[in-house]
């Protein structure tokens, strides 16, 4: 037992061994709120109330070994939701919320939307909640990721339809002729050579299958989805991707080569080009 504030400060000290101060404080807060089952107001208003976290030492060891805080607490914030996450599924990122906002702003009421490489289901579930009367499907190759996505769907958007499928092959037959107004994807896109630039909390814990692609063809997922997307998008349907900032020119050229038009690139909140949208052309079908 120790005062809430003392536990919080101990967690900050431990997290600071791996992370910058601001991030360490955010991590410490996430842990004490989740594991202590208290609110932020509880921590601020009554910092001296005693609290017990039985697994405290284990949590500290996990932090020192770079285990992501989202896996430690089993949750990740996304949009207005607190999604379940575990090893085996990519942790949702704030940049992806911006992609969701873009799709939601442009989607019409009742739109049919497909999320490819859904992971935790964050994109599909958020879009179902944000686009009135929408019909949303979500696909992933990983049974483990789909199990987590279905858990999240059951809690936040029970009518999202989850399908197991491989984005690298023509997956149109699995949807039995259903046509979509929008296809959105945050596929693997980080070149393997950039692995060394990333922190251990990503490279040692999050699934490689959701992150990395071979240097020889970093657009492999984008191209495959764009090619299948031509068959599955309604006239004037749109394809949306989260992208790697170093691949923008290649992405624009690839989409235009595949027959898409009105290719638009957007920057994220950090000013980096991280999202792209293109309209399908009936001529390209």
Give residue spans per PLM region.
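Non-catalytic accessory regions of SAM-dependent methyltransferases
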Residues: 1-48
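Conserved AdoMet
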Residues: 30-105
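Residue-level signal for inorganic ion chemistry
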Residues: 31, 66, 96, 123, ...
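Conserved beta-strand segments of alpha/beta enzyme cores
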Residues: 82, 135, 159-161, 261-264
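Conserved SAM/SAH cofactor-binding pocket of Class I
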Residues: 95-197, 224
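Mobile active-site "lid"/loop adjacent to the S-adenosyl-L-methionine
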Residues: 189-221
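Conserved Class I SAM-dependent methyltransferase catalytic core
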Residues: 215-279
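Flexible, glycine-/basic-rich loop-and-beta segments that form/coincide
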Residues: 282-285
């Amino acid at each position: 037992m120790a005062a809430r504030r003392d536990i919080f400060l101990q967690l900050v000290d431990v997290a600071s061994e791996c992370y910058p101060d601001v991030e360490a404080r955010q991590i410490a807060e996430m842990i004490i709120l989740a594991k202590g089952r208290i609110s932020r107001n509880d921590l601020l208003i009554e910092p001296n109330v005693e609290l017990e976290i039985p697994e405290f030492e284990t949590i500290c060891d996990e932090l020192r070994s770079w285990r992501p805080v989202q896996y430690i607490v089993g949750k990740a914030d996304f949009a207005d939701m607190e999604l379940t996450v575990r090893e085996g599924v990519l942790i949702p990122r704030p940049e992806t919320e911006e992609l969701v906002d873009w799709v939601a702003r442009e989607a019409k009421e009742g739109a049919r939307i497909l999320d490819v490489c859904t992971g935790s289901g964050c994109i599909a579930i958020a879009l179902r909640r944000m686009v009135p009367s929408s019909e949303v499907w979500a696909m992933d190759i990983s049974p483990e990721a789909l199990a987590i996505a279905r858990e999240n769907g059951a809690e936040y958007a029970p009518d999202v339809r989850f399908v197991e499928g491989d984005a690298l092959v023509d997956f149109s037959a699995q949807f039995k002729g259903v046509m979509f107004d929008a296809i959105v994807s945050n596929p693997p896109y980080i070149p393997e050579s950039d692995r060394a630039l990333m922190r251990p909390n990503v490279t040692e814990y999050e699934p490689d299958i959701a992150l990395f692609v071979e240097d020889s063809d970093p657009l492999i997922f984008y191209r495959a989805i764009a090619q299948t997307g031509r068959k599955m998008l309604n006239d004037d349907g749109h394809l949306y991707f989260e992208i790697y900032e170093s691949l923008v020119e290649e992405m624009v050229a690839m989409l235009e080569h595949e027959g898409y038009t009105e290719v638009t690139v957007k920057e994220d909140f950090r000013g980096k080009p991280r999202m792209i949208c293109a309209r399908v052309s009936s001529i390209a079908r």
